[in-house]
Curated annotation (Swiss-Prot):
Name the record gives this protein: DNA-directed RNA polymerase subunit beta'
UniProt enzyme class: transferase
GN (gene name): rpoC
Keywords, in A-Z order: DNA-directed RNA polymerase, Magnesium, Metal-binding, Nucleotidyltransferase, Transcription, Transferase, Zinc
Necessary cofactors: Mg(2+); Zn(2+)
HAMAP family: RNApol_bact_RpoC (MF_01322)
Keyword Nucleotidyltransferase: yes
GO BP, sorted A to Z: DNA-templated transcription
Residues that bind Zn(2+) 1: 60, 62, 75, 78
Protein task: DNA-dependent RNA polymerase catalyzes the transcription of DNA into RNA using the four ribonucleoside triphosphates as substrates.
């Protein structure tokens, strides 16, 4: 076996007929498969043991030689080599064809490769190949032209006229001769000469031909290899035949396709031997050609060959294509051993790094380790007995299992894995029952709930895998989300409710105004029932030595509540005491207003002091973020567990219930509804009189009902009692929002119609009153629309993620610093008056390109290339700096990746990014994962109109990343200057806008309907919009430069996500956008060898120009090209990655003609060939490290391979 980790690249090319014969172990001459009586393979058939190897290990076909000692002997009776039966998966055969046939990929693809080489149209080729016309191969000294087509009749006439002075043939033989005659060097030289003068279509065609001929010339492939004299037969175990019960056989479709080829081939041989008439032979040759076409790519030409039940047979090409093809099914996604799946259940008592593993499942997963341990402890005499013991589930097995799983992390994965937090490592704890227990706080990252979700579990086997699982993947380390650096592990539901209830304050509860010496006293008083949880009390802070109080505060009494004292007990000892849910308290400690002097009457203070709000979900998240920033992973993980326990306990004590009486009724509701009805009647009258159009009427009716609903909603909010259980749930962020209440207590409002609009008749009832039958029916439309939209958009979003991952998977942090001198000027993003992304958000975790100085004092605030954390970024913003030039992924010079300085901080852990981080994949996941949230927004409003509908969301994101023309396209100016006129042109139904620049003046004609956003006298810059809508980035890149286009795309993507309230770090979008703009099209090749019109990587282009300039030549010129992500993925340098993405056959056809070599730089291509991925710990710099031995060598840790070897040994002894 070759060691995949040894080779550097992988090349693909065309196979000549001689090459095919050299691969083969023998010729398949008969179409037979296996004998129906003996079930043994037939001689010379498709399963012949002489060609492909024995069906049983170390045994020839006739049974003369059995056992391993005859290894390598070829049996003199049956001719079968004695070897492992595994060779039937690797040995190929071949079929010698009686007539050459063309390979359908090269004749049929677009553009037809054969057509380009021969300069013939695909239609002409088809006529020749399928025996409809003759083609002139050598006109001799006749008036005929080479490659001229003739019908049968014309051919006979010319024969009569010229005799055998010329040579014309039909079929693949003719094409083969023509291809052999092609003089590559001559044709290339001639085409290059022609290109200098050619224009239009002729030029395009010449460039295409030149491209393909040059590819043949450089790759060493010969054009006539596109025609085959022999075809390979793939190993029999890759096209198996298995017996079903009832004596029938199931076989791979390939066997049927091969059988047809062999049958026709043998018939053709016989006809040729019999000297049959030409017309019969031609027909048989045509049928052979069709049979080979069907074998290679069934259905590419004409009707596909069908099997039983009219099902098209799966050919060799189909085996590679699509989700079920070889690439995506078997190479990129394999099923693995040591894995299982089960339903998940909540494990509220678990620590954050633990998961509950059902006993039976653990026993099966860790079986080899338990077996080894049993033998080691002398509890079983050998591996076999140990296995028996486990199968019987003896009592002493469980103790061994307990010991074996200690310190061995397992991986839990929930599908769909939308981002990298969909797989995390946990330490297993054995539990009873059959369900996996999951920590409640890990649900957010997995998007899991316990309504029947299932999860898969995997066991990392090797020491390295275990170390990586523990160091890099342990759930306790994944507190921040990679997309925005905010905590993803935030308490929700019960935990939020419990902590909200705990920190609630109420006036005049038991023990109000008591003053305590320290926290222990407070807790004792609470436990003995002297004080209520929500009572406001005084507490001396003198004993809290570690907490950051001011000296002045230490001598005073702090006013707080019993619950808050309990809450602060779980916080780190030197963390500020939390008394109010504000950032000020979180960062700087308790404000002075909560302190009273010794001797001051606390009751007087409490009488005038307002009740402080309890801690809601958002504040809990801020606490976690702050603790993570200061104390890092371990302490945060402990805090989360404590917060969880506290929350559950308090939620239980609170005993919150919801009854129908908790849904308040709004007395003035009826009045509001009646009022709206009156307004609608007025509008209808106006419409009937013809004063307004139907569209206006519809819009106004919708507006009236939405206003009525908003009015009811506002009054409901005002009338809610803060201790109402429903309002507590909503206010704390545990469950539900105002829209749910409006539907419960107010009115449901307008419903979505199936056509995507709104129904004019609202549902005026609420759920408490109950809906009428008519209202119920109307509600079902919206609910169904919500469900179907969700289902459709989830698929869309998943496909978007797949394309994003594919285009960016090879972007990895490759070096420390690329040394670029360019940067990106950034400022806050605004849309009109609305803030989309503040400057602070864009600065955190980035490095400035130049030193940042305070504009007023002139002092240096941030040095060049210094990573900005939250404090520095805030300081820069506070100093009044409005724009900063930062290092950006856009301007990074690193080839095939990004450098540390241009990328900045790794958002998932708040540290500077490390070399080897797969930032491309993380970026793709960060953009794709919220895509599903964008889509699922519909789901929760139950189809109520006015709920956020995200039609602009996902489709707009796809439009941007696929570089499609926007729906509402804006007109942009090509010159910088003044708008001198905006005139109407009634004849054309347009308006003319004239912009006068410094050197030239441009006029733009826009339709009447478009919204013009400039007026006379305005100064505008080139690339700016004159009408409303979205700019087409392909126009922008022509008018402005690449950086402006990149910036525009970044702005647009951020706009869509931020409007939805979803935060994504700029750098993720930058990574994706850079991948769309990394190609250039060569305009003038200068003295380089590049062909005009070639699409190539910027880095490769600059390298070629660099070499040309050094040798004193004229450099090539190019222009940047914006590619959509699908196109960019297919244009990658790796043919393996492209082929496994889409259009597999087209990619492989092209790659083989060019003799492409895959440099194996990305992740995908390495996964395909089974090499370790070149990211993270798989990078060369980490792989070639020599481990140092510290201290004595410990006892060797056993591995799976040791145990398997031991089992095999015991089997062979028997």
């Amino acid at each position: 076996m070759i060691d995949v980790n040894k080779f550097e690249s992988m090349q693909i090319g065309l196979a000549s007929s001689d090459k095919i014969r050299s691969w083969s172990y023998g010729e398949v001459k008969k179409p037979e498969t296996i004998n129906y009586r003996t079930l043994k393979p037939e001689r010379d058939g498709l399963f012949d043991e002489r060609i492909f190897g024995p069906t049983k290990d170390w045994e020839c076909a006739c049974g003369k030689y059995k056992r391993i000692r005859y290894k390598g002997i070829v049996c003199d009776r049956c001719g079968v080599e004695v070897t492992r039966s595994k060779v039937r998966r690797e040995r190929m055969g071949h079929i010698e064809l009686a007539a050459p046939v063309t390979h359908i990929w090269y004749f049929k693809g677009i553009p037809s490769r054969m057509g380009l080489v021969l300069d013939m149209s695909p239609r002409a080729l088809e006529e020749v190949i399928y025996f409809a016309s003759y083609v002139v191969i050598d006109p001799g000294d006749t008036a005929l032209e080479k490659k001229q087509l003739m019908t049968e009749r014309e051919y006979r006439e010319k024969l009569d006229e010229y005799g055998n002075k010329f040579n014309a043939k039909m079929g693949a033989e003719a094409i083969k001769e023509l291809l052999q005659d092609v003089d590559l060097e001559g044709e290339v030289a001639e085409l290059k000469e022609n290109l200098k003068s050619a224009q239009g279509q002729k030029r395009t065609r010449a460039i295409r031909r030149l491209d393909i001929l040059d590819a043949f010339r450089k790759s060493g492939n010969r054009p006539d290899w596109m025609v085959m004299d022999a075809i390979p037969v793939i190993p029999p175990d890759l096209r198996p035949m298995v017996q079903l019960e009832g004596g029938r056989f199931a076989t791979s479709d390939l066997n049927d396709l091969y059988r047809r080829v062999i049958n026709r081939n043998n018939r053709l041989k016989r006809l040729l031997d019999l000297m049959a008439p030409n017309i019969i032979v031609q027909n048989e040759k045509r049928m052979l050609q069709e049979a080979v076409d069907a074998l290679i790519d069934n259905g590419r030409r004409g009707r596909p060959v069908t099997g039983p039940g009219n099902r098209p047979l799966k050919s060799l090409s189909h085996m590679l294509k699509g989700k079920q093809g070889r690439f995506r099914q078997n190479l990129l996604g394999k099923r693995v051993d040591y894995s299982g799946r089960s339903v998940i259940d909540v494990g509220p008592t678990l620590k954050f790094y633990q998961c509950g593993l059902p006993r039976e499942m653990a026993l099966e997963l860790f079986k080899p380790f338990v077996m080894h341990e049993l033998v080691k402890r002398d509890m079983a005499s050998n591996i076999k007995n140990a296995k028996r013991k486990i199968d019987r589930q003896d009592d002493d097995v469980w103790d061994v299992l307990e010991d074996v799983i200690k310190e061995r992390p397992v991986l839990l994965n929930r599908a769909p894995t939308l981002h990298r937090l969909g797989i995390q490592a946990f330490e297993p704890i054995l539990v009873d029952g059959k369900s996996i227990r999951l920590h409640p706080l890990a649900c957010e990252a997995y998007n899991a709930d316990f309504d029947g979700d299932q999860m898969a579990i995997h066991v990392p086997l090797s020491d390295e895998a275990q170390a990586e699982a523990r160091m890099l993947m342990l759930a306790a380390h994944h507190i921040l989300a990679p997309k925005d650096g905010k905590p993803i592990v935030t308490p929700s539901q019960d935990v939020v409710l419990g902590n909200y209830y705990l920190t609630l304050e109420q006036k005049n509860r038991l023990g109000e105004g008591m003053i305590f010496k320290d926290t222990n006293e407070v807790l004792m008083a609470y436990q003995t029932g002297h004080v209520h949880l929500h009572s406001r009390i005084g507490l001396s802070v003198a004993d809290m030595a570690n907490r950051p109080f001011t000296d002045d505060q230490r001598h005073k009494i702090m006013v707080t509540s019993v619950g808050k004292v309990m809450f602060n007990e779980i916080m780190p000892a030197d963390f500020p005491y939390l008394n109010e849910p504000t950032t000020d308290n979180l960062m700087n400690g308790v404000p002075d207003k909560y302190f009273i002097d010794n001797g001051e009457d606390i009751h007087d203070y409490l009488a005038g002091a307002p009740v402080i709000l309890p801690f809601k979900k958002g504040f809990l998240s801020d606490i976690i973020a702050q603790v993570f920033k200061v104390y890092k992973v371990q302490r945060t993980s402990d805090l989360l567990d404590d917060m969880k326990t506290l929350g559950y306990v308090q939620a239980t004590h609170a005993g919150l219930t919801v009854g129908v009486a908790d849904v308040p009724q709004l007395p003035e509701k009826q009045e509001i509804v009646d009022d709206a009805h009156k307004k609608v009647t007025t509008i209808s009258k106006q419409f009937r009189r013809g004063l307004i159009t139907d569209e206006e009427r519809h819009a106004r009716v919708i507006e009236i009902w939405n206003d009525a609903k908003d009015d009811i909603q506002q009054r409901l909010t005002d009338s809610f009692d803060p201790t109402n259980p429903i309002s507590m749930m909503s206010d704390s962020g545990a469950r539900g929002n105002i829209s749910n209440f409006t539907q419960l207590a107010g009115m449901r409002g307008l419903m979505a119609a199936p056509n995507g609009g709104m129904m004019e008749v609202p549902v005026t009832s609420n759920f408490r009153e109950g809906l009428s039958v008519m209202e119920m029916f109307m509600s079902t439309h919206g609910a169904r629309k919500g469900m179907t939209d969700t289902a459709l958009k989830t698929a869309d979003s998943g496909y978007l993620t797949r394309r994003l991952v594919d285009v960016a998977q090879d972007v990895i942090i490759r070096e420390e610093d690329c040394g670029t001198d360019r940067g990106l000027l950034i400022h806050s993003l605004r849309e009109g008056n609305e803030m989309i992304e503040p400057l602070y958000d864009r600065l955190v975790g980035r490095c400035p390109m130049k030193t940042i100085v305070n504009p007023t004092t002139g002092e240096v605030m941030v040095a060049k290339n210094q990573l900005m954390d939250e404090q520095l970024a805030q300081a820069v913003v506070d100093a009044g700096v409005e724009e900063v030039t930062i290092r950006s992924v856009f301007t990074c010079n690193t080839k095939h990746g990004v450098c540390k300085k241009c990328y900045g901080r790794n958002m998932a852990n708040g540290e500077e990014v490390e070399v080897g981080e797969a930032v491309g994949t993380v970026a793709a996941q960060s953009i794709g994962e919220p895509g599903t949230q964008l889509t699922m927004r519909n789901f929760h409003t139950g189809g109520v109109a006015g709920g956020e509908d995200i039609t602009q969301g996902l489709p707009r994101i796809q439009e941007i990343f696929e570089a499609r023309n926007p729906k509402a396209i804006a007109t942009i100016t090509e010159v910088t200057g003044e708008v001198i006129a905006v005139e109407e042109n009634p004849a054309e139904h347009t308006r003319e806008i004239t912009v006068q620049g410094e050197t030239d003046t441009r006029s733009y004609s826009v339709p009447y309907t478009s919204n013009i956003i400039v007026s006379e006298g305005d100064m505008i810059h080139r690339g700016e919009k004159i009408t409303g809508g979205s700019v087409d980035p392909k126009q922008l890149i022509k008018v402005r430069d690449v950086l402006s286009t990149e910036n525009y795309l970044l702005h647009e993507v951020q706009k869509v996500y931020r409007m939805q309230g979803i935060e994504i770090g700029d750098k993720h979008v930058e990574v994706m956008v850079r991948q769309m703009l990394r190609k250039v099209r060569v305009m003038d090749p200068g003295d380089t060898e590049i062909l005009p019109g070639t699409l190539m990587d910027i880095s490769e282009f600059t390298d070629r120009n660099h070499d040309t300039l050094i040798s004193g030549g004229v450099p090539a010129t190019c222009r940047p090209v914006l590619l959509g992500i699908t196109k960019a993925s297919l244009e990658t340098n790796s043919f393996l990655s492209a082929a496994s993405f889409q259009e597999t056959t087209r990619v492989l056809t092209d790659a083989s003609i060019r003799g492409k070599s895959d440099p194996l730089l990305g992740l995908k291509e390495n996964v395909i060939i089974g090499k370790i991925v070149p990211a993270g710990t798989g990078m060369a710099k980490y792989r070639h490290m020599e481990p140092k031995t510290v201290g004595a060598v410990s006892e060797n840790v056993y591995s799976i391979s040791d145990i398997e070897a031991q089992m095999k040994q015991e089997e062979t002894k028997e």
